[in-house]
């Protein structure tokens, strides 16, 4: 079953009753792609000077969870810390997709918000290799 929604002058056809998919946690085990419960996909690749610094993944697990509220994010030391909720509200992401939006943790600390950035603590820079994480939304 599907329903039609309107957001910022665009029409969306979305699955009904996605509430059952709300909370999820996935542990990354080296896959290049992970299909999420809402149909979107995370893509992973190594890159020099980009992504989550690989040194943090030696001793801790990379976890993927949906936003649950109260998370904060600081991708740049010269800018203030932001709530994930505020970050997603300021984007053009439709409201019904925000609660399913994946965020990336190293251990229990927020490390990245796909397509938005890496928290300053976890950034790979210069000649350091990192794990790039990109989200492809379901259509």
Regions found by a protein language model. Name each.
Residues 1-139:
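AMP-forming adenylation/ATP pyrophosphatase catalytic core
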